């Protein structure tokens, strides 16, 4: 059984780690920058341990990267690199209107998401659900890694001319703006901003987090909807008024409609 030192936190890391733990011996899980000194100690004690990373959130120092040469630390990045380098590739793909979602396994280098690529896959027919997309991409990348540890192919360099970048999500992004956005854009923001920064809209003077929604079909009578700039409607299925518990649209109307 191959030994692994795993770097990561958040949903992408959780889904990837679940796959890796079934097939490998995880000798240490680094979750924060403060764990990097312990990584150096564990790696010296386990020189044959592979490094795998998924959504660690901080740059790995050169003194840590060097310990894993020549194989390097394998980074599961949820995009078709060099597209969507950076902190929010899945959310950026959702917001851009992409219908397919990709994952790359690359060798970690000092430059952000710029290392040579071992493997890429593109998944279609995924539900427009952020959790499902995270899970599918993390598992696809992790499964390839556990099946190829010890016999990795030669990685291929990225084409720097095709690189695009995405930044961190900010709390202010959660405020929906359907007065200027189409129903499609509003819906994609609701999907992309689940978890953080949380999509918000005000009904009857009550600010709410929108948890589940869909684009209303022609002729559909929605219980609760958000009117958008193109004349379309986003039907809200589940929501959470600030400071209150989650409820469906009908329950919200019964309690808050004036």
Where do the protein language model's features map onto the residues?
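A short beta-strand-loop structural module common to alpha/beta enzyme folds
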Residues: 26-36
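A short, Lys/Arg-enriched amphipathic alpha-helix followed by its capping loop at the start of a domain
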Residues: 16-25
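Donor/substrate-binding cores of folate-linked one-carbon enzymes
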Residues: 3-5, 10-12, 21, 56-166
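Short amphipathic alpha-helix with an adjacent loop that forms part of the alpha/beta core around
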Residues: 36-47, 66
């Amino acid at each position: 059984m191959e030994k692994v030192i795993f770097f990561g936190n958040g949903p992408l890391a959780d889904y990837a780690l679940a796959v890796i733990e079934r097939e490998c011996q995880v000798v240490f899980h680094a979750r924060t920058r403060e764990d990097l000194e312990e990584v150096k100690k564990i790696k010296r004690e386990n020189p044959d341990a592979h490094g795998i990373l998924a959504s660690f959130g901080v740059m790995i120092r050169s003194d840590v990267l060097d310990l894993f040469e020549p194989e390097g630390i394998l980074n599961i990045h949820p995009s078709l690199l060099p597209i969507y380098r950076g902190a929010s590739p899945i959310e950026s793909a959702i917001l851009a209107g992409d219908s397919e979602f990709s994952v790359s396994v690359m060798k970690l280098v000092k430059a952000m998401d710029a290392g040579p690529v071992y493997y890429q896959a593109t998944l279609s027919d995924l539900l427009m659900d952020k959790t499902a997309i995270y899970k599918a991409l993390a598992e696809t990348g992790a499964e390839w890694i556990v099946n190829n540890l010890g016999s990795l192919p030669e990685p291929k360099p990225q084409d720097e001319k095709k690189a695009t970048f995405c930044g961190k999500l900010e709390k202010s992004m959660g405020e929906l703006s359907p007065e200027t956005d189409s129903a499609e854009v509003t819906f994609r923001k609701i999907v992309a901003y689940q978890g953080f920064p949380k999509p918000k809209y005000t009904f009857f003077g009550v600010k709410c987090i929108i948890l589940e929604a869909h684009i209303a079909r022609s002729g559909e009578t929605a219980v609760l909807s958000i009117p958008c700039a193109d004349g379309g409607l986003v039907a809200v299925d589940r929501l959470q008024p600030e400071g209150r518990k989650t409820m469906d649209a009908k329950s919200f109307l019964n309690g808050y409609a004036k």
